[in-house]
Amino acid sequence: MNAHEVNFDGLVGPTHNYGGLSYGNVASQSNSQAVSNPKEAAKQGLAKMKALMEMGFKQGVLAPQARPDTAALRSLGFSGSDEEVIRRAAKEAMPLLAACSSASSMWTANAATVSPSADTADGRVHFTAANLNCKFHRSIEHPTTSRVLAAMFNDERYFAHHAALPAVSQFGDEGAANHTRFCKDYGDAGVEFFVFGRSAFDSRFPAPQRYPARQTLEACQAVARLHGLSEAGVVYAQQNPAVIDQGVFHNDVISVGNGEVLFHHEDAFLDTEKVLAELHDKLGRRGGRFRAICVPRDQVAVEDAVKSYLFNSQLLSKADGSMLLVVPEECRNNPRVWNYLDQLTGDDGPIREVKVFDLKQSMQNGGGPACLRLRVALQERELAAVNPGVIMSAGLYDTLVAWVDRHYRDRLSETDLADPQLLLECRTALDELTQILKLGSVYSFQLD
């Protein structure tokens, strides 16, 4: 059955800034208050999309959120016109304005969890927007995320959309950053791998002590039920709490999977042997041959994995059957990581090539190649039903670069967030973007 994995990358929004909002994300916290360059950030992301498209990979784009979010500020007691709301928030509660101005939706691995039609009970592709309950600045994203996804995947014959889980800590859900899928071919029934950091209701599971575990077992189970997944096609695993406390805030910072391969750090999971055995068994029953590539801690320490974002990479299947690992520049700058990658590609394993991208603007906020994309496996007929306006092409790339040049600033500091003109600039840009991507009205300011 002919099917493709399509990577939908998040377009970096015009308010990209370094607010240091993400406790537990080492890069985000260490670069707090630095001056950002939204124009460069957006172009770095677009360059990656274009390069992968030109290599033959299916590539799409996911629109950013409208920021500053004046509706969120109003819900917190700020009143008056939009301009007055921003000025008052800047004067009285700058951290709230920074949170409501975050461009964190660029990391579309957190947008939703996606289950392909081959896995689901009703034979449709299922989407559940992530509630991102752990962080206020991200918890306000899911209503717009749901509207954008519905505008992209709008044929009910093929696509089913679910609202985010209840916005409470017991159902904390971070989307595809804690989810991957193994399969022989993208169109075959596969095994969906859900990784959680803690259990909300079962005290037998340990929890990290320093940083919060953002994903619960109960959220994973709820998404699997919503998507109509069978027990034979699901594996749940607990991430090692010790690595969460070292800055591994999502599982895609310590492992990445694709096809029949899991590329992971030795310390990524609890009960690793049991987890790998279950993946091997369940994928085998679905016609696949599971293979784990374990990176030993004595070659790459967890600290190096977090600094370089070795595992926050894209693992892509090439036409010849081998795999390509897309990594950030920071991997090349870390001798231990780069030596390991040189050894990896020299071995007779599935990962034969490494491609490096400069994503510094995103990386300084704690997001690498994997954070920037949402993977959707689609049959040919499903791909044909996707809104064509969001599928990357040479023409769309040129249009989006020109759009960025027209609307984005090349410098943004925290004090700039207090400028009401920024709100006007962002809304003007996004109103035009919805026309470019043929999304219709998806933003609150378009619906009011």
Swiss-Prot record:
Superkingdom, taxonomy of origin: Bacteria
Function: Catalyzes the hydrolysis of N(2)-succinylarginine into N(2)-succinylornithine, ammonia and CO(2).
Enzyme Commission numbers on file: 3.5.3.23
SUPFAM superfamilies per UniProt: Pentein
Listed GO MF terms: N-succinylarginine dihydrolase activity
Binding site for substrate: 19-28, 110, 137-138, 214, 252, 365
Stated name of the protein: N-succinylarginine dihydrolase
Organism of origin: Pseudomonas aeruginosa (strain UCBPP-PA14)
Pathway annotation from the record: Amino-acid degradation; L-arginine degradation via AST pathway; L-glutamate and succinate from L-arginine: step 2/5
A Pfam entry, by short name: AstB
Any one biological process term the GO annotation gives: arginine catabolic process to glutamate
This protein's UniProt keywords: Arginine metabolism, Hydrolase
EC category name: hydrolase
Active site: E174, H250, C371 (nucleophile)
Xref: PANTHER family: N-SUCCINYLARGININE DIHYDROLASE
NCBIfam families the record matches: arg_catab_astB, PRK13281.1
Subunit structure: Homodimer.
Protein family according to the UniProt entry: Belongs to the succinylarginine dihydrolase family.
Catalysed reaction, written as an equation: N(2)-succinyl-L-arginine + 2 H2O + 2 H(+) = N(2)-succinyl-L-ornithine + 2 NH4(+) + CO2
